[in-house]
């Protein structure tokens, strides 16, 4: 498995959790159990995509952890929630060792959902792409999500469509006839979130999200600047990673690494 190879590779410090649907946990174990070496003391950390029945999902996770810890540990849960009650009921059922991220839609009750996450001490999730152009939210929609979470002190993660550091126009899948579209950059997202925490205006944040040229961002030991003027220092970046955007998900590990190497950042 690629994940097993990447865990022992030179950039394993960048690697987070393996994402697996709750319904496929047993299938995952059957395929991954031979990838654990006897000397592996850390084990695989898993983020589980919840099924329709959240109580059944939590039960599956609890049983899985009892059987296979410490080689495999489910310590994150990703839940789709469209109502306040879904967030509240899930939060009240979570074991202490399971952190949840709630994927919430930007509909009429969006602000109420973010407020509920804040009250419950939970985290949010935003979907930033897919396999068709219409699956990608606009920069303005992402900024609204980020500013709302920032104002409510709700950390979040992002998933899908973030294979590349900077905004670009690329094929959306690996198929020969794949549709092409504009993909958001994970550096754009992280840095925009950092500047949102410094109370930048929406039009400035939109410019950061839509930057396509590496020269716009300058990195050094002290932090990162945008056009040589506005800066995020190391402490602000540390706080951003802890209390702002925690992680992003990508189908590919090689593409983000190779792109960062091409930019001279690795």
Give the positions of each predicted feature.
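Expand to "…catalyze enediolate/carbanion chemistry for C-C bond making/breaking, isomerization
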Residues: 1-266
């Amino acid at each position: 498995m690629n994940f097993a190879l990447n865990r022992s590779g030179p950039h394993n410090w960048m690697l987070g959790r393996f994402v697996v649907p709750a319904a496929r946990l047993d299938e995952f174990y059957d395929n991954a159990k031979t990838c654990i070496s006897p000397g592996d003391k850390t084990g695989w950390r898993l983020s589980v995509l919840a099924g329709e029945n959240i109580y059944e999902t939590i039960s599956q996770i609890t049983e899985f952890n009892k059987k296979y810890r410490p080689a495999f540990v489910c310590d994150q849960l990703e839940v789709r929630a469209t109502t306040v009650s879904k967030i509240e009921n899930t939060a009240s059922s979570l074991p202490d060792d399971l952190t949840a991220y709630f994927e919430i839609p930007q509909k009429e009750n969006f602000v109420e959902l973010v407020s509920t996450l804040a009250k419950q001490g939970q985290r949010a999730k935003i979907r930033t792409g897919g396999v068709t152009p219409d699956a990608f939210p606009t920069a303005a929609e992402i900024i609204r999500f980020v500013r709302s979470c920032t104002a409510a002190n709700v950390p979040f993660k992002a998933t899908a469509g973030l294979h590349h550091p900077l905004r670009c126009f690329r094929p959306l899948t690996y198929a020969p006839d794949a549709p092409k579209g504009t993909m958001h950059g994970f550096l754009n997202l992280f840095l925009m979130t950092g500047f949102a925490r410094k109370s930048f205006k929406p039009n400035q944040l939109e410019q950061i999200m839509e930057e396509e040229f590496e020269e716009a961002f300058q990195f050094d030991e002290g932090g990162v600047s945008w056009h040589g003027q506005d800066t995020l220092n190391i402490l602000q970046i540390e706080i951003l990673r802890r209390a702002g955007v925690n992680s992003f998900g990508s189908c590919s590990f090689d593409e983000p690494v190779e792109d960062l190497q091409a930019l001279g950042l690795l």
